[in-house]
């Protein structure tokens, strides 16, 4: 099976779609070139982080309860690294419907020339798998963004610097992924604080994102923070951000290689932080090496009326704010005809994205994997996951 070549890009892999409207097809072609090389290897950096924002009732579906959401990042990373058929230390939290996107990420990862690197930030439990420790476990989760003082400024500066060092050390094309329950709400706060119109553009893991609750928490946090009219990215992070955003923005600023951002609004917030930290003349340079990759379920979601789905509108708003064109693509994987009900739940608006699933699936397609084979791989992986769950109960 051969990777996609540049001559094929006029017709993207089956089902893949362009996200946003500010990036020309020629620009998109340039963005895709490093990800279509069949003889290339890539780096995957998965950042796990925690914020007390996730403990607000109804804010996130990345775990059915606040207690279970404290383990979501560890459980998802465990599944990504070890797969569904092997014993894992961290059980997956119960979900309202569907299955963890880490399962999809694992299936794609098995078909790609990359080794994952995991970093843990502010988790309440120590990871039992190999990982980068970028700060002491005693640092704990970020405070709820509604406090207006989510992190101490010293912590933000320290994490940003560590992200910059990490970004400078990684040399191959980099896929950046995250698992941060509550992270779409901190993303909404960061984007709004940095001047990006976000009303009706931020999704979440729930089938019906709690828009009013998110808006209330964001307004409460920004009111209490009393930020100046043109705050620095670091000041915004200290007020309403989370540890993932600080490290990821630092990585993005210092990385000189192509970067594939795996996700939706959380990665849009990271791109916004990075762009806001740079002088005007350097912003286009950064935008030209960044591509956002998402799932079709997130990229095609309409939250408000408009000319295009919410994620595309959000990318365009970020680009307009900083005078650049941000490129985005959605993977072509769909589960309409899957034999697995938990996978078909994705088509009904549950889960949608996470743990870099969209970017990993997109990269697998760009490297020549057919969507039918990826669907079958996800179905087999879910068979294994369900069988292992039954075995553990016996």
Swiss-Prot record:
It comes from the Bacteria. One of its GO terms (molecular function) is nicotinate-nucleotide-dimethylbenzimidazole phosphoribosyltransferase activity. Coiled coil: none annotated. InterPro entries: Nict_dMeBzImd_PRibTrfase (IPR003200), Nict_dMeBzImd_PRibTrfase_arc (IPR002805), Nict_dMeBzImd_PRibTrfase_sf (IPR036087). HAMAP family: UPF0284. Belongs to the UPF0284 family. NCBIfam families: PRK04447.1-2 (NF003369). This is UPF0284 protein SYNW1869. It comes from Parasynechococcus marenigrum (strain WH8102).
């Amino acid at each position: 099976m051969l990777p996609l070549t540049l001559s094929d890009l006029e017709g993207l892999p089956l089902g893949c779609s362009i996200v946003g409207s500010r990036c020309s097809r020629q620009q998109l072609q340039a963005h895709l070139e490093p990800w279509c090389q069949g003889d290339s290897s890539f780096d995957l950096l998965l950042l796990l982080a925690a914020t007390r924002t996730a403990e607000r009732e109804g804010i996130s579906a990345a775990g059915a309860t606040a207690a279970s959401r404290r383990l979501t990042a560890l459980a998802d990373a465990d599944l990504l690294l070890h797969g569904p058929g092997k014993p894992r230390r961290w059980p997956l939290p119960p979900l309202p419907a569907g299955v963890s996107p880490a399962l999809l990420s694992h299936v794609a990862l098995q078909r790609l020339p990359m080794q994952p690197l995991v970093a843990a930030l502010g988790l309440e439990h120590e990871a039992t798998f190999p990982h980068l420790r970028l700060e002491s476990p005693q640092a704990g989760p970020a405070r709820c963004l509604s406090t207006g003082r989510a992190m101490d400024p010293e912590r933000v500066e320290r994490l940003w610097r560590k992200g910059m060092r990490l970004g400078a050390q990684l040399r191959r094309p980099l896929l950046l992924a995250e698992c941060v329950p509550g992270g779409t709400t901190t993303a909404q706060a960061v984007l709004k604080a940095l001047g990006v119109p976000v009303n009706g553009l931020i999704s979440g893991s729930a089938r019906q994102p709690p828009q009013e609750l998110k808006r209330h928490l964001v307004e409460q946090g920004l009111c209490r923070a009393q930020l100046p009219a043109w705050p620095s990215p670091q000041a915004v992070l200290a007020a309403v951000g989370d540890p993932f955003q600080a490290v990821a923005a630092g990585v993005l600023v210092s990385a000189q290689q192509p970067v594939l951002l795996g996700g939706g609004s959380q990665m849009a917030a990271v791109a916004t932080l990075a762009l806001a930290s740079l002088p005007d003349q350097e912003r286009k340079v950064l935008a030209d090496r960044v591509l956002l990759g998402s799932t079709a379920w997130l990229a095609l979601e309409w939250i408000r009326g408009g000319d295009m789905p919410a994620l595309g509108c959000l990318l365009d708003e970020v680009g307009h704010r900083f005078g650049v064109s941000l490129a985005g693509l959605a993977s072509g994987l769909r589960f309409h005809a899957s034999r697995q009900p938990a996978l078909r739940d994705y088509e009904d608006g549950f889960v949608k994205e996470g743990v870099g699933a969209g970017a990993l699936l997109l990269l697998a397609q760009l490297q020549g994997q057919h969507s039918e084979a990826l669907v079958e791989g996800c179905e087999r992986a879910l068979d294994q996951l369900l069988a292992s769950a039954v075995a553990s109960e016996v």
